């Protein structure tokens, strides 16, 4: 989120960490993820919403027709989620880029991840990280990572349909749309 704020506040674009990449990218600043519960027979969306609440989101998002967390609250919620992942033994590496993936036959014609190769963006150092499980939260614009996975023989499947865009508005416009004549009032 730090680099995303850097773009918005200082107009400094970090091409490797911005509104589309990293923590704070790939849709963090959008409530679309809160509405994605259509055709959800296993109620996974509800479980995800509960994770948001457990991390500090307002409990009303569990029952409101149009749930909204708010940008400033959402940043803290995502930071709390990161801390929980780390507490549970997960590892999150900022300022690192995936540059290689080590796969080995799993015995059933499938492949198993054995290691990741990452490069530190601050000094260029390359690290090999042994692992058997990986979660890559890529967003939609990590073309270099998709190419790397494809070239390594990792099975990839496109979503059936996806369209999106981001329209940015001054906060004062959003406040007026949401709060009407009360926009700008200190308690709001």
Stretches found by the model and what they are:
Residues 1-29, 33, 37-51, 55-188:
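Residues forming the flavin
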């Amino acid at each position: 989120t730090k680099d995303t704020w850097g773009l918005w506040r200082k107009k400094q674009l970090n091409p490797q960490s911005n509104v589309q990449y990293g923590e704070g990218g790939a849709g963090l600043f959008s409530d679309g993820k809160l509405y994605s519960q259509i055709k959800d027979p296993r109620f996974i969306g509800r479980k995800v919403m509960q994770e948001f609440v457990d991390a500090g989101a307002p409990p009303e998002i569990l029952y409101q027709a149009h749930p909204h967390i708010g940008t400033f609250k959402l940043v803290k919620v995502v930071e709390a989620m990161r801390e929980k992942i780390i507490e549970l033994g997960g590892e999150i590496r900022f300022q690192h880029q995936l540059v290689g993936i080590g796969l080995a036959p799993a015995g059933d014609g499938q492949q198993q991840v054995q290691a990741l190769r990452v490069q530190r963006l601050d000094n260029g150092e390359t690290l090999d990280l042994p692992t058997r499980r990986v979660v890559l939260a890529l967003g939609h614009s990590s073309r270099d990572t998709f190419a790397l996975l494809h070239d390594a023989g990792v099975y990839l499947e496109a979503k059936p349909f996806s369209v999106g865009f981001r329209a940015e508005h001054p906060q004062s416009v959003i406040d007026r749309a949401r709060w009407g004549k009360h926009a700008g009032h200190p308690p709001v």
